């Protein structure tokens, strides 16, 4: 068949023209254009379904969504849920786009094997590392699992082995192996399992280098044997085989002290005309972390092989007062929106003054845990209000949270409400 007709596109698999099939789907990249028709998609899915089962419609639509998501689309979605961290959003958008493209196996056309690139998120507590990873899974419509690296131990020791991470991913995918095999795993506190020293110790490092080595095996791509219900393996147990080649691993950690390692490497390079002596200590630390190199992570205590399997690094900045105000009011699932919705079920209109919102952010900053304390502050502040509203009180009323209430730590209500507005007691 002559494929030189400029007016027609052809399926790259069966060579049928676009006017011979119902649908012809292409990738959105500017490079090699690849086309696949609906008939080839159906045939491929049937071949897979005979062994693994599954629903054509859900799998087909999910795959199409993966193909059509551009980095810009991913970033727009992330920005609706995460405040700030523009650089991290940019990095993750590109990383997820490339990961989806490799999963679509366009590389099979060009005979180029594309290896996945796992991601390292470096940032202080409460800066949004976990939220970014969760939101990335949501925009990509893939299962998501999270693990705390400090709970993992190498095989033969008490604790969770690394396969337990994959068990959680299977559970998130409702034990659909094919779906789990393209999911996202977020491993938090990765900085807590660093090697204690650069020299080899004769004692076993149960939760340090040994765990890095164990994680390395599943992160670089292997067929793992996963206990169906999690927990430790035992001989009588049946295992589920999970191919980790297309699972995206995102690691996160605060890496306290990493800035000092970077500064030591750069010592002397900022002296003279290039030095900015006007920078604050916090600004200097922030800018330093953005210069992190693989050698710095190795010096910190990650083994070279592990660093090599997490080639993409994104640094998250500490949230300031303005950021915390935005966290409270701007995202699609902003905390204040959530509490207003909760009280709306009891027919109570909840409002916050601008000064109250600012005071909540100020109080959260005093804990030095980023956005993590915001919910706890609001829970304590609104406890009595939610209790009374849940019992039918305040129905049809408007409650205005003021700065004084925030400073007091709870919303003290004046039951002699005037103009349907309930205020703090004098």
Swiss-Prot record:
One of its GO terms (molecular function) is zinc ion binding. GO terms for cellular component: HslUV protease complex. The keyword Chaperone applies. One of its GO terms (biological process) is cell division. Residues 1-56 form the ClpX-type ZB domain. Zn(2+) binds at residues 11, 14, 37, 40. InterPro entries: AAA+_ATPase, ATP-dep_Clp_protease_ClpX, ATPase_AAA_core, Clp_ATPase_C, Clp_protease_ATP-bd_su_ClpX, ClpX_bact, P-loop_NTPase, Znf_CppX_C4. SUPFAM superfamilies: Glucocorticoid receptor-like (DNA-binding domain), P-loop containing nucleoside triphosphate hydrolases. Gene3D superfamilies: 1.10.8.60, ClpX chaperone, C4-type zinc finger domain (6.20.220.10), P-loop containing nucleotide triphosphate hydrolases (3.40.50.300). ATP binds at residues 124-131. The keyword Ribosomal protein does not apply. Component of the ClpX-ClpP complex. Forms a hexameric ring that, in the presence of ATP, binds to fourteen ClpP subunits assembled into a disk-like structure with a central cavity, resembling the structure of eukaryotic proteasomes. ATP-dependent specificity component of the Clp protease. It directs the protease to specific substrates. Can perform chaperone functions in the absence of ClpP. Belongs to the ClpX chaperone family. NCBIfam families: clpX, PRK05342.1. This is ATP-dependent Clp protease ATP-binding subunit ClpX. The lineage of its organism: Bacteria, Pseudomonadati, Pseudomonadota, Alphaproteobacteria, Rickettsiales. The gene is clpX.
């Amino acid at each position: 068949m002559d494929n030189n007709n400029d007016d027609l596109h052809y399926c790259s698999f069966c060579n049928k023209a676009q006017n011979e099939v119902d649908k012809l789907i292409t990738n959105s990249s500017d490079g090699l254009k690849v086309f696949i028709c609906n008939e080839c998609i159906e045939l491929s899915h049937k071949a897979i379904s005979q062994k693994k089962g599954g629903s054509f419609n859900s799998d087909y639509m999910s795959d199409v969504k993966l193909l059509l998501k551009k980095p810009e689309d991913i970033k727009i979605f992330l920005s609706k849920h995460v405040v700030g961290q523009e650089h991290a959003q940019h990095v993750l958008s590109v990383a997820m786009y490339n990961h989806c493209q490799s999963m679509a196996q366009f590389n099979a056309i060009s005979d180029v094997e594309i290896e996945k690139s796992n991601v390292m998120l470096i940032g202080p507590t409460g800066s949004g590392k976990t939220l970014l990873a969760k939101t990335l899974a949501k925009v990509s419509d893939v299962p998501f699992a999270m693990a705390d690296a400090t709970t993992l131990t190498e095989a033969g020791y008490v604790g969770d082995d690394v396969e337990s991470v994959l068990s959680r991913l299977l559970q998130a995918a409702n034990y659909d192996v094919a779906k789990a095999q393209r999911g996202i795993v977020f491993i938090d506190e990765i900085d807590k399992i660093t090697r204690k020293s650069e020299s080899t110790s004769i004692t076993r490092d149960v939760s340090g280098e040994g765990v890095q080595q164990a994680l390395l095996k599943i992160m670089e791509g292997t067929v793992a044997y996963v206990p169906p219900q999690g927990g430790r393996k035992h001989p009588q147990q049946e295992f589920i085989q999970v191919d980790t080649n297309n699972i995206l691993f995102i690691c996160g950690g605060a890496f306290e002290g990493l800035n000092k390692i970077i500064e030591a490497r750069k010592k002397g390079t900022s002296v003279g005309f290039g030095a900015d002596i006007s920078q604050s200590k916090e600004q200097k630390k922030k800018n330093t972390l953005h210069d992190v190199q693989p050698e710095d992570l190795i010096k910190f205590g990650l083994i070279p092989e592990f660093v090599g399997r997490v080639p993409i690094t994104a640094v998250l900045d500490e949230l300031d007062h303005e950021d915390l105000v935005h966290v409270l009011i701007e995202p699609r699932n902003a905390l204040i929106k959530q509490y207003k919705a909760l009280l709306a079920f009891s027919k109570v209109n909840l409002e916050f003054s601008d000064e109250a919102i600012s005071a909540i952010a100020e109080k959260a900053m005093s804990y030095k845990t980023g956005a993590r304390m915001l919910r706890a502050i609001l829970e304590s502040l609104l406890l009595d209000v939610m209790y009374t509203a849940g019992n039918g009180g305040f129905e049809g009323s408007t409650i205005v949270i003021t700065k004084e209430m925030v400073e007091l730590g709870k919303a003290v209500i004046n039951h002699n409400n005037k103009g349907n507005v309930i205020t703090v007691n004098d």
